[in-house]
From Swiss-Prot:
Gene Ontology cellular component terms for the protein in this record: cytoplasm
GO terms, biological process: 'de novo' AMP biosynthetic process; IMP metabolic process
Biological function: Plays an important role in the de novo pathway of purine nucleotide biosynthesis. Catalyzes the first committed step in the biosynthesis of AMP from IMP.
Top-level class of the enzyme under EC nomenclature: ligase
Alphabetical list of Gene3D superfamilies matching this protein: Adenylosuccinate Synthetase, subunit A, domain 1, Adenylosuccinate Synthetase, subunit A, domain 2, Adenylosuccinate Synthetase, subunit A, domain 3
Protein name: Adenylosuccinate synthetase
Binding site residues for substrate: 298-304
Keyword Nucleotide-binding attached: yes
Organism, as annotated: Coxiella burnetii (strain CbuG_Q212)
Free-text cofactor note: Binds 1 Mg(2+) ion per subunit.
Assembly and interaction partners: Homodimer.
């Protein structure tokens, strides 16, 4: 069985934990888009691990981890992550494979990203400043440096020389930044070359072989669907396609071979950086939500904006991803709220609507229409049995399923992989739950 697991909001939904939990039964986990701007936090027996590029399956012995062609790969970030895992006694290089078609993220991408955000000032998009957007620009413009170029040092030098000269024009003459030295960039890449070279291969072929052997494969998304470059809240989006279609194009795996698409969603909503957020809470409730959820970015440390669950945006996410199941995370964050609110419609220009406005600029002025439900005001932290869930919490989950039309198959009640209620088996899960 081949399953896509992705975020349904603006990222930070808890995908890493769910992927890690499900990898007990899989042969491989694939990253298919994004770069080291994504942080997947895993907590196992109290020990925290943050992964940015390497798939979450790396913490399971014997699971093959693949980085697909849709990822933009920073060599120094990758090596730093490998070293961090090795220091914890986790071997990486034997189980990690990188698509030869994967584009590399280089110093001029980072320099451009930071210069552009500084130029925009108060109108900045709110990128992580890690060069993701400029790296994807080079890919589309066909001047990108790919992993396979590391196999041909002479050609690599010429490509870097040309790309650096091109970007230096912007850096020096438009942004008034110090130009970069192509030789230094090349020398740095050559330092990483010998370590990365053995991991470069044909990821599409590997996936094809696993499929023919009827092995289970997870395709692990980064960020969230509302940050998709085409379908998200543009221009406040990331630079890759974060939706289910990207699992095929970003890995070289045929779309008809996917069996399920699981969408990860928090029991509330968060967002980092600028952009419309209809259910955002800027009051004490929002602060309480952020504090209880420890809502700070795992990569940037930036505080996340918090708000009530948005049924309207979630329905759109279900449609564009063809979700077959929903994983509800961080339910325990709502334990102390006397009242729970669900946004079931928007009020835009005085009119109540049940779909996001096609004109994204109108979303900024849309107000949420709420349905109120009683809270449970008792701890759900660490529960593993659905029958032990407070009645009000079960009612909340049932109402979500009714409004969304998709079953909630897994509920996360805490950060550890064991803090989980599995209502419907994904593969052959050993963990089971009543309800």
């Amino acid at each position: 069985m081949n399953i896509v697991i992705l975020g349904t909001q603006w990222g930070d939904e808890g995908k890493g934990k769910i992927v890690d939990m499900l990898t007990e039964d899989v042969a491989a986990v694939v990253r298919f888009q994004g770069g080291h701007n994504a942080g997947h936090t895993l907590i196992i027996d109290g020990e925290k691990t943050i992964l940015r590029l390497i798939p979450s399956g790396i913490l399971r012995e014997g699971v093959l981890c693949l980085i697909g062609n849709g990822v933009v790969l920073s060599p120094p970030a990758l090596m730093e992550e490998i070293e961090e895992l090795n220091a914890k006694g986790i071997p990486v290089t034997e189980r990690l494979r990188i698509s030869s078609a994967c584009n590399l993220l280089l110093p001029y991408h980072v320099a451009l990203d930071k210069a552009r955000e500084a130029e925009l000032g108060t109108k900045a998009i709110g990128t992580t400043g890690r060069g993701i957007g400029p790296a994807y620009e080079d890919k589309v413009a066909r001047r990108g440096i790919r992993a396979m170029d590391l196999l041909h040092p002479d050609q690599l030098l010429e490509k870097i020389k040309k790309a650096t000269a091109y970007h230096n024009i912007q850096l020096e003459h438009y942004y008034h930044q110090t130009p970069l030295d192509y030789q230094s960039i090349y020398n740095q890449l050559m330092e990483f070359r010998e370590k990365i070279k053995p991991m470069i291969g044909d990821v599409s072929a590997l996936l094809g072989n696993l499929r023919r052997q009827n092995k289970h494969i997870i395709f692990e998304g980064a960020q969230g669907s509302l940050l998709d470059i085409d379908l998200g809240t543009y221009p406040y989006v990331t630079s890759s396609n974060t939706t289910a279609g990207s699992a095929a194009t970003g890995s070289g795996f045929g779309p008809l071979y996917f069996d399920r698409v699981l969408g990860i969603t928090k029991a509330y909503v968060t967002r980092v950086g600028a952009g419309p957020f209809p259910t955002e809470l800027t009051n004490e409730e929002g602060k309480k939500m952020a504090k209880r959820g420890n809502e700070f970015g795992s990569v940037t440390g930036r505080p996340r904006r918090c708000g009530w669950f948005d049924v309207i945006s979630m329905r759109r996410t279900i449609q564009i991803n063809s979700l077959t199941g929903i994983v509800l995370t961080k339910l325990d964050v709502l334990d102390e709220f006397a009242k729970i609110h669900l946004c079931t419609a928007y009020r835009c220009d005085g009119e109540v609507v049940n779909e996001p406005p096609f004109d994204q600029s109108l979303l900024e002025s849309c107000e949420p229409v709420y349905e109120e439900m009683p809270g449970w005001q008792t701890s759900t932290y660490g529960l593993t049995d659905y029958s032990e869930m407070p009645k009000e919490a079960r009612n909340y989950i049932s109402r979500l399923e009714e409004l969304l039309g998709v079953p909630i198959t897994i509920i996360s009640t805490g950060p550890d992989r064991k803090h989980t209620i599995v209502r419907q088996a994904v593969f052959n899960q050993v963990i089971t739950a009543k309800g």
